[in-house]
Design a protein with these regions (language model features):
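N-terminal intrinsically disordered, cationic/polar leader segments
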Residues: 1-121, 129-152
Length: 152
């Protein structure tokens, strides 16, 4: 059974409507000494990163309220080293923005809770496609990310 939303989160859900999800920036790289086509990938570990960096409420010239949520996602292929930090062989990172129209001005608490618990749900399909595409272009091992809902 799903956990019941807090009052402030439910108010945000009722007030916000997704308008757009887009890529703000990205970076992808294989290290100089790493040839993904000719490497034994069984020794590599895949680590993931996901963070909601920030959110902001804007008022357009037409008086509309917009919530922008900045979400950073990443994956990296590492070679574990005993008693030391792993050696990064390749990585793919992306910053996405999710934009929502806001029916009424929300309290900061509601905006923050929504940003942390719901925005990633809207960004995730774009990240899955982006990561899959970058893996193919870089000839990295395919990473299949599950469909996911973030309910922290």
């Amino acid at each position: 059974m799903a956990a019941k939303n807090s009052v402030s989160l439910q108010k945000a859900i009722d007030s916000l409507s997704i308008q757009d999800v887009y890529l703000k920036s990205s970076q992808a790289e294989c290290c100089e000494d790493f040839d993904p086509k000719r490497t034994d990938h069984t020794e590599l570990l895949v680590q993931q990163m996901h963070t909601v960096r920030r959110s902001e409420v804007l008022k357009t010239n037409e008086g509309e309220l917009i919530l922008k949520v900045y979400v950073r996602l990443g994956a990296r292929w590492v070679l574990p080293i005993e008693n030391d930090d792993p050696e990064v062989k390749a990585f793919v990172e992306a910053d996405f923005i999710a934009e929502y129209s806001m029916a009424e001005l929300l309290e900061t608490e509601a905006v923050e809770e929504f940003s942390l618990k719901n925005a990633s749900f809207h960004v995730w399909p774009y990240w899955r496609e982006f990561l899959s595409s970058q893996c193919e272009r870089l000839r990295l091992p395919r990473v299949v990310l599950p469909t996911v809902q973030f309910n922290c």
